[in-house]
Regions:
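Conserved phosphate-binding/catalytic loops in two-lobed NTP-binding clefts
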Residues: 466, 481-493, 720-723, 732, ...
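A phosphate-binding glycine/aspartate-rich beta-alpha loop in the early core of alpha/beta enzymes
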Residues: 80, 163, 225-288
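Intrinsically disordered, low-complexity, mixed-charge
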Residues: 1-182, 186, 193
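Internal gly/pro-rich beta-alpha loop/helix module
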Residues: 66, 169, 323, 327-402, ...
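Glycine-rich phosphate-binding/hydrolytic loop that grips phosphoryl groups
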Residues: 491-512, 516-518, 557-566, 750-776
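Short glycine-rich phosphate-binding loop at a beta-alpha junction
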Residues: 219, 457-469, 717-728
């Protein structure tokens, strides 16, 4: 070793696999005259750097200031080992990956980068129109991964040996594909083909484009599974897809050719554009323009539409190719599955599940190891507000400052299922799995849990599930063979909000959603909790009502409306007069509901805030039934928002209600007087007052009730932090009105940002509870 030379061992932790980290290290080392090695150890990248103190300092500074675009460096540990080594390095080398134990971070799938896009459409480039073009900065990661460290032989690309040209790029540090594990080209990479037809490669893409142009439906395999695709400007084919999918009203996601098309169709803020065009490319819920070209049946009676940009090369090629076919610049791109089932990822699944839904299926022979549905994101206060966290975001971990040790698996909720693995203070939420009412989704959950345990090298000390004894998620947890910890649904919601915000103080939790199994065996869903990681107390709830008719009541808000009206009138004749005036149901239907209520037939006590919204939507004549989850409550929100927008100058934020009538106290808990609110809304509607105004008033008074309950909880407990969670808080109007009032009253408000407030986010709360229990 030369005089003044030092040798340092440097370990870099974070998302440093599958993002071109080692090639970047090598380039920085060369630029600063550093000799040594870089090696992928799995949990971290290890660097041996030899040079003068000035050279090493410059190298480290470059590494910190200019990491790869997609990397997330969480920490860098350095150690001067000059006194412990006599090794003299002659150059700087990337050496073969080695497996070691430690913190593991897995890269998410990354949308095609601008450089690859430019190459793909350059006729002079050897990857011209290549459907699987990628580089160190972009391409599939999680969805092709078999095991760590992230190297080609541990991905589904191991089946495609590199050609000499690709191998040359792979080993040349001057190229963008230096050490890019999925690197391939038209000669050596995967191929696209039509299932059940002879066309492959270019012919298959041209055939697909022609069908779509002619108004047909095609299933297309992407990065995380199949999509069903058709012309989003063609009313006839969109209606046909709705009929085939048995999806009468739920909005379809749309893929636009580029951001200029999105701006033509939707209102896009600069902050939204940054997410839309970024490397994760979620579906963004955007406000539609009235003069857009989308078929009305894409998102019926909805002021918003979910839009994304192409993130896989093959999707770009559907829009643009050299075959002379003029394509629409907007395509429906909805998950390739039948109702209730997980997204299809294999040809056999697609043939079985999608054949009757489409006219052709464009697939490819790069295997998908883990399904990844598209991420869905809204915006609130000009910030991302996650609705479904999946492709591009999972499995990026959430880290807390808690000094927790252990390993847990949380299986998540029954609906919108995701699971979460906790390792010490790190929590890895899975991609979206789906609703576990379907046994195919249960199987997908079991498969994905097994693969995640393998990738993260985890053997849980406990598995955490919901309290409900008959949920399929509970059965999955029990069958895994680990000790089972059960946690109440709404408590898990609040813990998920606390964990995302890294809050370790006791909080007042407001959990508003559609349903959850309560500790008393009734249906909960409009809850005020006093919570910390160790336990919770039910401090308050909305007014209980009878939820009659089982599953039907979740889809038919008129049933809940009848129950509530009968509940406060306590008189069949008067109740029927109101129902008849409002057109809620037939006289025969009302008699059945009255009898069920009187005799408690198929009737369960409920405090579901979701059903409260459905009932008010029915009473106001907005939606009496929901064709999909949340349709009635979302329509109520849209009516209220439209009224607010049109009457901004006339709306007073000052609340006139006497605080004493917003709440009343029972021997069990405080009760938000939502029965009184429903009665007031009903009577006002019968007087002919404006529907939009009443929809807004409902939101306004409910926010005031929540605030009053939190004030009582603060007086009782001394807590001044409020956590807002549950699917009802996807309603941005209620969230804003509630947050504003709480802030006015001096509360610190915790809310979700990158974890969904709905059931897709509760697994991280379950995992945090389980981890806390392990510390005892």
């Amino acid at each position: 070793m030369y005089k003044n030379e030092m040798t340092w061992r440097i370990r870099v932790y974070g998302i440093v696999q599958g993002v071109g980290f080692r090639p970047t290290v090598s380039r920085h080392a060369t630029n600063h005259g550093i000799y040594g090695t870089v090696c992928n150890k799995g949990p971290y990248v290890e660097i041996y750097a030899q040079g003068t103190k000035e050279q090493i300092d410059g190298f480290l500074n470059s590494l910190k200031e200019h990491p790869p675009k997609r990397a997330a460096v969480l920490k860098i540990n350095t150690e001067d080992i000059t006194a412990d080594t006599t090794e003299q390095f002659e150059q700087f080398d990337i050496i073969e990956s080695e497996k070691t134990k430690g913190e593991i971070f897995i890269s998410q799938d990354i949308a095609i980068c601008d450089e690859c896009k430019a190459e793909m459409f350059d006729p002079k480039d050897r990857r011209y129109l290549h459907p699987f073009i990628n580089c160190t900065c972009c391409g599939p990661r999680l969805t092709i991964l078999d095991a760590l460290p992230y190297d080609r032989e541990r991905t589904s690309m191991k089946e495609f040996p590199m050609c000499p040209d690709c191998a040359k790029e792979y080993t040349d540090e001057k190229t963008r594909r230096y050490d890019a594990q999925p690197v391939c080209c038209n000669q050596c990479g995967p191929q696209v083909y039509l299932i059940g037809r002879p066309e492959r490669g270019r012919a298959a893409i041209t055939y697909t484009r022609r069908l779509i142009r002619e108004g047909k439906i095609v299933a297309i395999k992407g990065i995380g599974g199949f999509h069903l695709c058709c012309d989003a400007t063609n009313e006839e084919v969109v209606c046909r897809l709705r009929t085939l999918k048995n999806r009468p009203a739920k909005p379809f996601a749309v893929m636009a050719k580029d951001e200029s098309v999105v701006k033509r169709e939707c209102v896009v803020t600069p902050e939204q554009e940054a997410i839309l065009t970024g490397h994760q490319k979620p579906i963004l819920l955007l406000d539609r323009r009235s003069d857009g070209g989308l078929a009305s049946s894409v998102a019926p009676n909805n002021p918003k539409v979910g839009v994304m940009l192409p993130y896989a090369p093959v999707q770009l090629l559907i829009f643009q190719y050299d075959d002379g076919i003029e394509m629409p610049d907007l395509l429906v791109m909805t998950s390739g599955n039948t109702s209730g089932a997980p997204i299809c990822r294999e040809d056999e699944e697609a043939v079985a599940e999608l054949s009757h839904l489409c006219d052709a299926m464009l697939s490819h022979n790069r295997k998908i190891r883990i399904r990844a549905d598209d991420t869905v994101m809204d915006f609130y206060r000009n910030e991302p507000y996650m609705i479904r966290r999946s492709r591009g975001y999972a499995p990026l971990p959430f880290m807390t400052k808690a000094d927790w040790k252990g390993q847990v698996l949380a299986v998540g909720g029954e609906l919108k299922n995701t699971f979460c693995i906790g390792v010490d203070n790190r929590f890895y939420p899975s991609p979206y799995v789906g609703d576990l009412e379907d046994l195919r989704t249960v199987k997908a959950l079991q498969e994905t849990i097994h693969r995640f345990q393998t990738l993260l090298e985890v053997k849980p000390q406990a598995v955490v599930c919901d309290l409900h004894p008959k949920y399929n998620s509970t059965v999955v947890a029990e069958e895994l063979g680990y000790p089972v910890i059960r946690v109440q649904h709404h408590y898990a919601h609040i813990l998920s909000c606390m964990t995302e915000n890294d809050c370790h103080d006791p909080v007042i939790g407001v959990a508003f959603d559609g349903t959850g199994y309560g500790t008393d065996g009734t249906i909960w869903g409009g809850e005020i909790l006093l919570a910390d990681y160790g336990n919770f107390t039910r401090f308050g709830s909305i007014t209980p009502f009878l939820q009659m008719g089982g599953d039907a009541s979740a889809k038919e808000g008129w049933r809940i409306a009848v129950s509530m009206i009968y509940g406060y009138t306590k008189d069949r004749k008067r109740a029927w007069e109101i129902m008849e005036t409002l057109g809620l149901c037939s006289e025969q239907e009302s008699r059945v509901q009255f009898t069920m209520a009187d005799r408690k037939i198929n009737a369960v006590a409920s405090t579901s805030a979701g059903r409260l919204f459905d009932a008010v939507s029915a009473i106001l004549g907005i939606r009496r039934r929901s064709g999909f989850e949340g349709e009635a409550s979302t329509a109520l929100q849209f009516a209220a928002e439209a009224y607010e927008q049109q009457n901004l100058s006339n709306i007073s934020q000052e609340q006139k209600e006497n605080k004493d009538i917003l709440l009343h106290e029972t021997k069990e808990r405080f009760v938000l007087n939502t029965q009184m609110l429903v009665q007031q809304i009903t009577e006002a509607k019968m007087r002919g007052e404006d529907t939009g105004m009443l929809a807004y008033r409902f939101h306004q008074v409910l926010a005031e009730m929540i605030t009053a309950a939190c004030i009582k909880a603060k007086e009782s407990s001394g807590r001044d932090k409020v956590a807002l969670s549950g699917g009802v808080f996807q309603n941005r109007l209620l969230l804003r009105l509630t947050e504003e009032r709480l802030l006015q009253e001096g509360f610190e408000v915790l809310r979700h940002r990158m974890i969904p407030p709905n059931d897709g986010g509760i697994a991280i709360g379950q995992a945090a509870y389980g981890m806390y229990q392990l510390q005892k």
